[in-house]
Structure formats: C-alpha cells, structure tokens
C-alpha cells in the first residue's frame, strides 16, 4: 500500500510525520527533493531505501546529501509541463542526461538567438515532435545548459544535457539550495527578494547551525537573515488537513 500526503500535508507537523513513518514503514519516497532532504535530516532514514524526486530541480548538494543518507544513487532527469514532462534522463554513466530525441529537438542558443555548438553554454531551446494539443517550436525554456560533446561512456550517441539551471539575474532558488543545503544542520529555509536584495529565514537543528549559516551567507554578501533553531517534533509542515490512505 501507500500513504498519499496530498500537497505535503501532515496536520500534526514533523512529529506526526515521524509517527506515520514508523507506523507505515515505507521503503520508497516520491516527491520534491528538498522536502525529502528536510525529512531525512529531521526524522532520519528509517525504512526508506530509494527515492523518485520530481516536481522541482535537484541541486547537486541536495542530491549528494540524499545519496549519502540513503546509500543509493539518484538518477537526474529533466522535463517540464510544456514539453510533456519527460525530456532527458541520466544513464548508468552519470555523465549528463540523454535527451529523448524521438520526442524533442534540442538546441542551445546565445542571447541573440544564434545556435551554439556542442559544449557551449547558453539557453535551452526545445522543439517538440508529434505533440498535437500544444506543439512547441523553438520554445525558449529560460533554462541554462549545454549539450555535452562526444559519445557517452555508456556507449550511446544520443545527445546529453549537462546540469540545468534557471536564467535569473538575481540568482536562482536552485543556487541558494546549492549554497545552503550543503550545511548539514539546515532543515529548510525561505528567501524573499526585497528591493533587489535577498532576505533569508533559515531553520536548523543544532547549536552551531546558526553560526555556520551566518558564515556562509556573509561569504556571499547576504546581510539580511533570520535563523531559528527548531526541534523536529515542533516543526510544522505545509498547511492543510488531509492524509489519504490507498
């Protein structure tokens, strides 16, 4: 069976989540990567052995931390609603993500719309093949990546996408994830852009968490923050009231 926590909902907070994990003994997690890492850091690994992370980008530091806790590998993939979700997926070589070339044509362009050769970084452009309801023709995704040149170590010649990130002049949330989730004491954080400056609220679990977070933020010249230590049983999860069992 499975326990569906709709929209991440557990009414009683992390203490209730921990009770459900102990009672149900799930071996697989399906959901957002940062939510998984927060859960693992607050509740521990428990019975979970593997994970399918989706719905959000998975930064390298988050992926590394999850892999270390679960002692397994994650398989990065790329997609979006506009292109029909599935666009590229990692292979056993873990050297980039193979594009689904039977589904979409992939290009990398510069700021003027010129197509760049393999190996050059630029904006990812997608043309879908066979989509009738919403075909995309040279759709500018707003994502920054490159096509890795040469054949993959797995032997396939299918095009590979490198690490994908958002094109954001103020710095993307993914970059903040890379920066902050490397701190083992961090459970979660939120960031606001006010007058072009970042304001960060961070939740951590140990006495030296605030000092480590403060040091990282100061290195990046982020001067506005609020750090708060939390106990796992007191940490509230996403608002809502429904837990559906199937």
Q: At which residue positions do the language-model features occur?
A:
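Conserved short alpha-helical elements in the N-terminal third of ANL/AMP-binding
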Residues: 1-2
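Active-site glycine/GP-rich loop and adjacent strand/helix microenvironment
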Residues: 5-246
